[in-house]
Amino acid sequence: MYAENYKRFEELIDKLREFEGAIIVEGPRDEVALRNLGVRAEIIRLSRLPLSEIALIASSYGEVMILTDFDRKGEELARKLLRYLEGYPCRVDSETRKELKRIAKKDIKGIEDLYGLYLKVISVSDPHLEGIR
């Protein structure tokens, strides 16, 4: 990741921490990474139910963030989820995923790698903060 993206990456992590809706991820390691980052929002894993049921459950939170991985499968899942969620009265955030992908794709394959990248970024951007956050 380029140094000029460190601040924006940290802002996106803060956005995840402050999010109060439901976050949709692919699997348990993605959930663990988000919890390690301090995310307190409801996390719904795709590995448990059909997409139509996931969309219904997630929409009940009023606000939904799609955080699938950055590979072809993750892209396809994100597109399908967006289509399912269009039929529900909820706000869908797919932009956070797109921005994370844009600034971090060279460093990580997916959501499960966010925590490791975060630790790396804070140690490089401000070594005095390592271990504090």
Swiss-Prot record:
UniProt binding sites for Mg(2+) 2: D69, D71
Residues that bind Mg(2+) 1: E26, D69
Keyword check for Magnesium: yes
Coiled-coil segments on the chain, per record: none
Cofactor note: Binds two Mg(2+) per subunit.
UniProt keyword list: Magnesium, Metal-binding
UniProt keyword Mitochondrion present: no
Lineage: Archaea, Methanobacteriati, Methanobacteriota, Thermococci, Thermococcales
Family matches, as HAMAP family: UPF0292
Domain of life: Archaea
Known cofactor(s): Mg(2+)
Protein name in the entry: UPF0292 protein TON_0187
Gene3D superfamilies: 3.40.1360.10
SUPFAM superfamilies according to UniProt: Toprim domain
Paired cysteines (S-S): none
Domain Toprim: 20-100
Family indicated by similarity: Belongs to the UPF0292 family.
Alphabetical list of Pfam families matching this protein: Toprim
An example molecular function term from Gene Ontology annotations: metal ion binding
InterPro entries according to UniProt: TOPRIM_dom (IPR006171), TOPRIM_RNase_M5-like (IPR034141), UPF0292 (IPR022972)
